[in-house]
């Protein structure tokens, strides 16, 4: 089973990918993580990618495809993969399809985690964490029982991520919609695009994804 999970930062892609790794033995393939590992490997392809990135240029599609091709041939991908961060253009999507076809593989589903931008912004900007034990809270959805005191450890110190602000979240959402807009029709035309409610709770999103996979 080979999937692409689409969704903006904060939609819960990582949570669902980790669950699929745990329950189905699939492997999450983040192109960012793969590029860093490729550069560390010192292979000819890694050296080429490193030189390109150090020059401030985008890594060419053919390098990305070769990197993904090599990665999915590893034994841990035998039960399938979940691709994250690629493709972002129709040209990349077409190249990915060709590469998979040459291996006798295909994408079974492209799952879009659909979110409401305003609601997602509220979800992200309201997050805060106990500075001592790391327990997560939310201004609206999960406040401590006693204001200013952690339910778990009693600490009175809390932190917020610097980038969990409305301006930064808005820019992330804008970038996501701009990047994914071209490839949604491509996968819809091929009958593999499915949608789940990314604003539902984690268990419900998982149920919807499992229903898609079960077919």
From Swiss-Prot:
Q: Does the keyword Nucleotide-binding apply?
A: yes
One GO cellular component term, please give it. Answer: cytoplasm
Q: What does this protein do?
A: Catalyzes the reversible transfer of the terminal phosphate group between ATP and AMP. Plays an important role in cellular energy homeostasis and in adenine nucleotide metabolism.
State what protein this is by name: Adenylate kinase
Keywords, sorted A to Z: ATP-binding, Cytoplasm, Kinase, Metal-binding, Nucleotide biosynthesis, Nucleotide-binding, Transferase, Zinc
* Residues reported to bind Zn(2+): 130, 133, 150, 153
Q: Which GO terms describe its molecular function?
A: adenylate kinase activity; ATP binding; zinc ion binding
Query: Could you tell me the EC number(s) of this protein?
Result: 2.7.4.3
Q: Which NCBIfam families match?
A: adk, PRK00279.1-2, PRK00279.1-3, PRK14527.1, PRK14532.1
Task: Quote the record's binding site residues for AMP.
Answer: 31, 36, 57-59, 85-88, 92, 161, 172
Its domain comment says: Consists of three domains, a large central CORE domain and two small peripheral domains, NMPbind and LID, which undergo movements during catalysis. The LID domain closes over the site of phosphoryl transfer upon ATP binding. Assembling and dissambling the active center during each catalytic cycle provides an effective means to prevent ATP hydrolysis. Some bacteria have evolved a zinc-coordinating structure that stabilizes the LID domain.
Which reaction is catalysed here?
A: AMP + ATP = 2 ADP
Q: What residues does ATP bind to?
A: 10-15, 127, 200
């Amino acid at each position: 089973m080979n999937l692409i999970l689409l969704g903006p930062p904060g939609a819960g892609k990582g949570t669902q990918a980790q669950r699929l790794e745990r329950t189905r033995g699939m492997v999450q393939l983040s192109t960012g993580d793969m590029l860093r590992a490729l550069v560390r490997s010192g292979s000819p392809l890694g050296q080429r990618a490193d030189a390109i990135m150090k020059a401030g240029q985008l890594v060419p599609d053919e390098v990305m495809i070769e990197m993904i091709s090599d990665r999915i041939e590893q034994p841990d991908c035998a039960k399938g993969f979940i691709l994250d961060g690629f493709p972002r253009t129709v040209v990349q999507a077409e190249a990915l399809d060709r590469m998979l076809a040459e291996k006798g593989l295909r994408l079974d589903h492209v799952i879009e985690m659909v979110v409401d931008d305003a609601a997602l912004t509220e979800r992200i900007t309201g997050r805060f964490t106990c500075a001592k034990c790391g327990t997560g809270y939310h201004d609206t959805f999960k406040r401590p029982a006693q204001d200013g005191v952690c339910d778990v450890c009693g600490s009175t110190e809390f932190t917020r991520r610097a980038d969990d602000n409305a301006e930064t979240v808005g820019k992330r959402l804008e970038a996501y919609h701009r990047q994914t807009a071209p490839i949604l029709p491509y996968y819809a035309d091929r009958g593999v695009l499915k949608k789940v409610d990314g604003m539902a709770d984690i268990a419900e999103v998982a149920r919807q994804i499992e229903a898609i996979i079960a077919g």
